[in-house]
């Protein structure tokens, strides 16, 4: 056994990294081969097998190293390509930003334009402007009509007064009332254009002069009262004109004008109803007759006292619409059979027709009057009913 020599092969060295380079270098540390001694045979040739394997391993490692180096050299190129792509993206974003900035401004201008179009349409439909324009046109036509009447000097003054009245009316706060005044002036124009007597024209001129002074100081309640009085006098003056058809027309127009001024100048509290210069309240709760009188006094009013057929019809309609039995300020508590209002005035004989059939019958000591159905009924005063209060509108109340 000592004669034979053992083949010894130094194994392939470990791969190491050369710290002096930025790349990676792999190499075999030592390749030592032990020559075989003895006979050259197939067995001896086979002793070279490990050497072949080592060469193959070295070749494989060299190929891997080359591939790694290729990839490493490609990295700066890809980084450069990525940087150029970022530059392109940045430029595109810059252009997009500028475009969006212009688009936003343009869209805002478009929006402003549309708003102006809508505002133009809205302003064009404003009732105040159109109504004032119509009032101006009507007064211009009235000027032409009045200018053709016989008394030039007086009619010219009337025209001037109406012009000033136009300016005063143009400053009134409620647009709907401006429209009412415009309609009334239109009717008045037609009536004045056909007045037959110069003396009556003079009276109208004087009344319009007073009306101008009153309208010029409209905010004061005392002046509102003056307007009412002047219109009443004007109504009386026109009522004396000889032409009956024109009298009636002008009277009706002045009545309507008075109503329009009352609605414009006078106000009722919330939940109260305006009618012919007064405010009316129908309660939502029930009390006996005496407590109803007290309830009205507590709000500066009076359990309703009826003064005219028009007022009776209005109140009867209000009561029937609400389907409520309601106390009025009428009783015969002081003397049985003698009906008297709470203000001390007696019941007019012309009002007897408003009692329901068979009433008053004093059945069961019934001494207080109520609205019942389509007329009046007497009832016991301790019965709980709704009640109706009445008071003048604010513009006619003494300060």
UniProtKB/Swiss-Prot annotation:
Assembly, per entry: Homotetramer.
InterPro entries to which the protein is assigned, alphabetical: C-type_lectin-like (IPR001304), C-type_lectin-like/link_sf (IPR016186), C-type_lectin/snaclec_domain (IPR050111), C-type_lectin_CS (IPR018378), CD209-like_CTLD (IPR033989), CTDL_fold (IPR016187)
Molecular function GO terms recorded: D-mannose binding; metal ion binding
Gene Ontology BP, a term: endocytosis
Biological source species: Hylobates lar
Entry binding sites for Ca(2+): 359, 361, 363, 366, 377-378
Disulfide bonding pattern of the chain: 265-395, 268-279, 296-389, 368-381
Membrane-crossing residue ranges in chain numbering: 50-70
Entry membrane topology: Single-pass type II membrane protein
Segments in the Cytoplasmic topological domain: 1-49
Protein name as annotated: C-type lectin domain family 4 member M
Main location: membrane
Keywords: Adaptive immunity, Calcium, Disulfide bond, Endocytosis, Glycoprotein, Immunity, Innate immunity, Lectin, Mannose-binding, Membrane, Metal-binding, Receptor, Repeat, Signal-anchor, Transmembrane, Transmembrane helix
Region (7 X approximate tandem repeats): 108-269
Domain C-type lectin: 274-390
Domain remarks: The tandem repeat domain, also called neck domain, mediates oligomerization.
Ranges of the Extracellular topological domain: 71-399
Role this protein plays: Probable pathogen-recognition receptor involved in peripheral immune surveillance in liver. May mediate the endocytosis of pathogens which are subsequently degraded in lysosomal compartments. Probably recognizes in a calcium-dependent manner high mannose N-linked oligosaccharides in a variety of pathogen antigens. Is a receptor for ICAM3, probably by binding to mannose-like carbohydrates.
Short sequence motif named Endocytosis signal, residue ranges: 14-15
Compartment(s) where it occurs, according to its Swiss-Prot or TrEMBL record: Membrane
Source species, domain of life: Eukaryota
Gene for this chain: CLEC4M
Carbohydrate-modified residues: 92, 361
Record-linked PROSITE patterns: C_TYPE_LECTIN_1, C_TYPE_LECTIN_2
The Sequence repeat ranges on this chain: 108-130, 131-153, 154-176, 177-199, 200-222, 223-245, 246-268
GO CC annotation terms, alphabetical: membrane
